Amino acid sequence: MAHARSVSGVTLLDQGVYQGVWSAGLRASTNWSTLIDRFDVILSRTAPDLVVLVEADMKTIMNRLRSREDGDTRFAPDSQAFDRGIRGYESLKNRIRSTDTAPASIVIENETREDLSSGVDRIAESIHSIHN
């Protein structure tokens, strides 16, 4: 979520600066800590007001990737790219959650439709608390 500074209201971004760092790092050979350090200035200047971390257990993620009919994915389960992607997510999550200057963040589960429904409620509550 990014608050549009010049416009009243809220802007929701499905992908933001943290997603961009993860995507760049997915194909890089640099370790995640070094990569995130390199992007630190950009992250601190362009960070949204709220980062929503969406999680599911590993089995669910792997099953969802395998069930994609068109095979459209940047990495297959049980691949080096998959493992790197997971490590990158965890590295970014740890950075977001452990840095005083990082934006607010919440973790929502994405195992079931009910999880998504309660996650939407939590996101709305978080947005409301940030902007009131």
Residue ranges and their predicted role:
Residues 9, 49, 105:
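Conserved acidic residues
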Residues 15-16, 44-67:
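Conserved phosphate-donor/acceptor-positioning beta-strand/loop module used by diverse small-molecule
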Residues 1-42:
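Glycine-rich phosphate-binding loop used to anchor ATP phosphates in small-molecule kinases
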Residues 1-5, 58, 97:
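Hydrophobic, well-ordered secondary-structure segments
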Residues 66-132:
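NTP-dependent small-molecule kinase module
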Residues 19-22, 60-63, 115-117:
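Short catalytic/ligand-binding loop motif for oxyanion handling, primarily in non-cytosolic enzymes
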Residues 28-32, 36-39, 45, 53, ...:
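Short, structured coil/loop segments at alpha-helix boundaries
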Residues 28-32, 55, 59-60, 87-91:
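Short, functional N-terminal and low-complexity linear motifs
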